[in-house]
Amino acid sequence: MTSGPAGATRTGVNVTVRYWASARAVAGLDSERFAGLDVSDVLGAAAAAHTGLSDILGVSTILLDGRAVTASEPLSEGVTLEVLPPFAGG
């Protein structure tokens, strides 16, 4: 077991979550580590740690080591999840 934000205890593997654009602004940092068994576990922990992040996660593309994944994707120790919110522009 590992401790996450605010002393929460979670089981699973250690994963780095890297935030981009508006997700980075809401989280207030570039990246952080959480533990979980699948993408849903880790993103749930991130959303619980940062007010407003849940809305951004709902519209973001999530990459696992550069590959788009769904919430049920299992995780391996040491992987990186990237949160890519939609980008505006043209």
Where are these regions (language model features)?
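Ubiquitin-like/PB1-type beta-grasp interaction modules and other compact soluble beta-rich domains
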Residues: 1-89
